[in-house]
């Protein structure tokens, strides 16, 4: 009988406790930063917590970490994640632009250059909510880098990257296959838009014996294309296609228009990325390299870029400016001439809608009634994100700390919540306790007497061990 009972009894762990190394550990600075960011992502409301509470959450996640509140504060400041850090790196003042040549603007808008916001689009007359302000196709179209291998095998359009589901014979009958290489177009429009660029970028490697000095070295381009795919380096891929478009444009207008856009060097942008631990840069996927490694990568890309354009080399500084210019002006990888003039506001007055067919471009629609003389704005970030996240993304990717009305209101609300949360919580707890006591003892209340045998010592509270005895059925 006793043996039967013993077989039904076992010692188990409760509260889903997991064995953890309890020995103290001093975490690496990147571990601490990653932990804080993980906390913020799991619960965005924690971004407005004070340092003591944030430190407590870090310790709760990693009880064995030997880390002080002071070190957490110092690391967040070092990596530009302390929101009230006045030393956060910005680069908006280093962004330059000039008036755009040969631009055909919509009838109801015009460009104004200001000292504080640079170029901007302003309404020439009142615009009603829902009105189509303008639509435009890309000045520079960049196909999806991820579809490069599908383009090579005729599984995607060689110009726009759209996946193809038609049979090869049908494509041939429509005259959409290339008569030199294996690539195909998805439509007459794409074949027309590609023009001579397709053959310049991908065909002259078929004439290795030609003594004619090539404007574009196709073999070097295909090598760069594969390198960009391997490294997931969309900006290098994009500026190579942009420069190819510019040097083959006999009018020279495209180069002038690209040069007139908001310009900044990529190494300047990287300082902001590096100061934020690389975590919130949507254009770089959060990848972080130390400065020396990043410069080495840029120089490899630069050498490959130069080999593509043997007759039209650019200086290394200009290469970095091209990359920075592309990164702050592109939308869905494409570059639009008029849309690139829209400045940011977290509560923008326009809605920019990209088409499912990326070659069709975009539409800009009035998000509310816009008065004559009012600046047209768009939002560079998701307006539903917390003010802390929006401002980090804007600082890293576009170089400024937003001070729009929405940001100011959100910050004020955060401060009010922080100051009133504890007081309200305590007040609610007291009210609940008083109500429960009143319900339990009635209106007369109770009076407690001190026991005659009381010796002044408190009895220890009941304490449960982490191990309990369970009986198995």
Swiss-Prot record:
GO terms for molecular function: histone H4K20 methyltransferase activity. Pfam families: SET (PF00856). SUPFAM superfamilies: SET domain (SSF82199). Keywords: Chromosome, Cytoplasm, Methyltransferase, Nucleus, S-adenosyl-L-methionine, Transferase. Its EC number is 2.1.1.-. Residues 107-381 form the SET domain. The keyword Ligase does not apply. This is Histone-lysine N-methyltransferase SET5. It comes from Candida albicans (strain SC5314 / ATCC MYA-2876) (Yeast).
């Amino acid at each position: 009988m006793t043996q039967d009972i013993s077989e039904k009894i076992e010692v188990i762990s409760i509260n889903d406790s997991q064995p953890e190394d309890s020995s103290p550990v001093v975490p690496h600075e990147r571990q601490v930063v990653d932990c804080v960011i993980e906390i913020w992502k799991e619960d965005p409301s924690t971004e407005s917590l004070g340092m003591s509470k944030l430190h407590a959450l870090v310790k709760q996640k990693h009880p064995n970490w030997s880390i002080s509140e002071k070190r957490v504060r110092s690391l967040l400041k070092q990596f530009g994640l302390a929101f009230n850090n006045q030393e956060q790196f910005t680069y908006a003042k280093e962004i330059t632009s000039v008036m755009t040549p040969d631009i055909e603007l919509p009838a109801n808008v015009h460009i104004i250059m200001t000292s504080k916001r640079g170029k901007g689009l302003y309404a020439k007359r009142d615009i009603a909510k829902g009105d189509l302000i303008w639509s435009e196709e890309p000045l520079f179209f960049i196909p999806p880098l991820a579809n490069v291998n599908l383009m090579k095998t005729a599984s995607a359009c060689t110009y726009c990257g759209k996946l193809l589901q038609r049979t090869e014979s049908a494509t041939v009958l429509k005259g959409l296959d290339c008569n030199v290489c294996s690539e195909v177009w998805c439509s007459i429009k794409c074949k027309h838009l590609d023009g001579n660029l397709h053959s310049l970028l991908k065909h002259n490697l078929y004439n290795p014996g030609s003594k004619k000095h090539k404007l574009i070295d196709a073999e070097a381009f295909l090598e760069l294309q594969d390198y960009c795919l391997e490294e997931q380096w969309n900006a290098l891929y994009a500026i190579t296609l942009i420069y190819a478009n510019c040097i083959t444009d006999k009018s020279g207008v495209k180069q002038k228009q690209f040069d007139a856009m908001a310009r900044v060097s990529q190494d300047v942008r990287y300082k902001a990325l590096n100061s934020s631990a690389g975590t919130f840069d949507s254009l770089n996927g959060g990848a972080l390299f130390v400065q020396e490694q990043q410069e080495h990568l840029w120089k490899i890309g630069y050498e490959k870029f130069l080999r593509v354009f043997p007759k039209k080399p650019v200086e290394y500084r200009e290469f970095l400016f091209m990359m920075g210019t592309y990164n702050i002006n592109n939308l869905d990888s494409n570059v639009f001439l008029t849309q690139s003039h829209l400045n940011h506001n977290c509560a923008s007055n326009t809605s920019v809608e990209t088409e499912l067919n990326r070659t069709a471009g975009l539409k800009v629609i009035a998000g509310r009634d816009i008065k004559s003389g009012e600046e047209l704005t768009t939002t560079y970030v998701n307006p539903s994100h917390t003010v802390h996240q929006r401002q980090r993304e804007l600082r890293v990717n576009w170089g400024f700390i937003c001070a729009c009305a929405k940001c100011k209101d959100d910050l004020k609300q955060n401060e009010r919540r922080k100051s009133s949360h504890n007081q309200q919580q305590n007040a609610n707890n007291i009210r609940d306790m008083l109500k429960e006591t009143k319900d339990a003892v009635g209106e007369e209340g109770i009076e407690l007497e001190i026991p005659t045998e009381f010796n002044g010592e408190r009895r220890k509270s009941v304490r449960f061990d982490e191990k309990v005895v369970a009986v198995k059925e």
